[in-house]
Amino acid sequence: MTTSTIKPTGGDEVPPAGVVGNVADVGVAASLTKRDSEEDTWASKGYNYINPFVHRIEIDSHIEVAKIYVLTVLLLPIRVVGCVLSLISAWMFACIGLYGMTLDDLKAKPLTGWRKQMQYMTACGMRMVYTFGSFHYVTMKGRAATAKEAPILVVAPHSSYVDSILVVASGPPSIVAKRETADIPLLGKIINYAQPIYVQREDPNSRQNTIRDIVDRARSTDDWPQVVIFAEGTCTNRTALIKFKPGAFYPGVPVQPVLLKYPNKYDTFTWTWDGPGVLRLLWLTMTQFYNRCEIEYLPVYTPSEDEVADANLYANNVREVMAKALGVPTSDYSFEDVIVMSRARDMKIPFPGDIVEIERTIEKLGLNESQRDAELCKGFLRLSNTDRLDIITFGELLQVDLKNTDLHKLFALLDHRRSGTVSLKSFLLCSLFCKLKNSDLLTFLRALIHLYSESSQQIDRESFVRLMRHAGGKLNEQKAQALFYALDTDNLGYVSFDSFVELTEKQKSSYKFLYHKSEHIRRPKAVVTTAEN
């Protein structure tokens, strides 16, 4: 069951006072947060549909809030000291176990004898880190397969830095990590001791080498540890399983699905794209008396011939099994969608957390293949009441039948205030971004000119500064004003976009970000054309 449709998950009402929307403001309602992209732009927690990249901590008890502050003073310092000492202990055990060994030695054969025992001691030290960090209870369900039965552990959902507790509690198994990880102070030695499979990002053959290493370990007669892979590739809020990256499934070997659950009263450790930062999460997690983690091993999944030949099919089928066991839907969202949302946020696009759903709805309406947004953009400043459009006017402007359900969905996605109205500017910014997200910033800025100025040849200072806010966060107000004055050498009070382009071309080393194309983002189906005047 795949979901990408509007689905209420918390009602349309703003939560009552006392609900924590931002971890820094305990006891303060913060369902809606003002962004600085436009006056009429808001970002909400995405309760129109299941958005796996949004998380809010809801603590509605004044007693609980008081407890957090009391334990911050009485318990948190002790826990921090305990975590640090445990980490140092684990590092010391790892250093002893690695004495006289190189990375090549670790890659050549599995650890045996006393080095294997020291590896267990290192894992115990890391387990104490989590114990001091409030995770006193880790429940194991199901039977953990051996490395010969399932060389790969596919873990989901991936929602937090705490998920690494699985590595500590399960052996430890190996992980797939960037080569640079080995150089991290303290943790680098500990990770090395788990005999990870390192990925060389600068090597174009890195993926094939990683697959070969996994297959070699699986077929070896030596006692290699299993390899843990978080198949989602990014953190989610556990409301749905997003698309699995196929890396764990390319080798075509049996895998064991592993579920991570956190049956606690408050979710203070989910770390998503739109949510509390890691330090705030650590603070709230370590000021609980204790937290629970549940690790469930599902039966080994042996791929069919079709699945061995098609890693994506294999990944999707394993995901369905895990979603059914968790009782959650699967989602069309993927790691690449996080890249799109991050780019939208950097470019001050309204509702960046919803931009993927907005794009899908625009495509269903066929607006991605039309030039209606460019036409509306060109005449935008001559329109009235564009910040308060009802559904009828909105449909007429888009030239879409009012009976079209996707029009109503798009309207709901843009109506974060639940006022029954939407902003035309917000829609145009979203629509143009969806079409031009693979283009360079200069092309995108050119498409937005008429949202701020009647003519591309006479852009006043205020309009120029507002336009530059969409330059990926590289040109703040102070820099944009300085750039305007550098262009307006004759003190006319306005500049042309062409003069701006000319200056950036002459100083391309300073403005190379304007010419960079994000080829890794999904390509749009159509390209928008814009008029200059």
From Swiss-Prot:
Reactions catalysed according to its record: a 1-acyl-sn-glycero-3-phosphocholine + an acyl-CoA = a 1,2-diacyl-sn-glycero-3-phosphocholine + CoA
UniProt short sequence motif HXXXXD motif, positions renumbered to this chain: 158-163
Segments on the Cytoplasmic face: 1-79
EC number: 2.3.1.23
Bilayer-crossing regions: 80-100
Outcome recorded upon mutating I175M: In RNA edited version
Phenotypic effect of disruption: RNAi-mediated knockdown in larvae increases lipid droplet size and reduces lipid droplet number in fat bodies.
Superkingdom of source: Eukaryota
Major site of localization recorded for this protein: endoplasmic reticulum
Pathway(s) this gene product operates in, as recorded in its UniProt entry: Lipid metabolism; phospholipid metabolism
UniProt-listed PANTHER family: LYSOPHOSPHATIDYLCHOLINE ACYLTRANSFERASE, PHOSPHOLIPID ACYLTRANSFERASE
Name of the protein described by the UniProt record: Lysophosphatidylcholine acyltransferase
Species whose genome carries this gene: Drosophila melanogaster (Fruit fly)
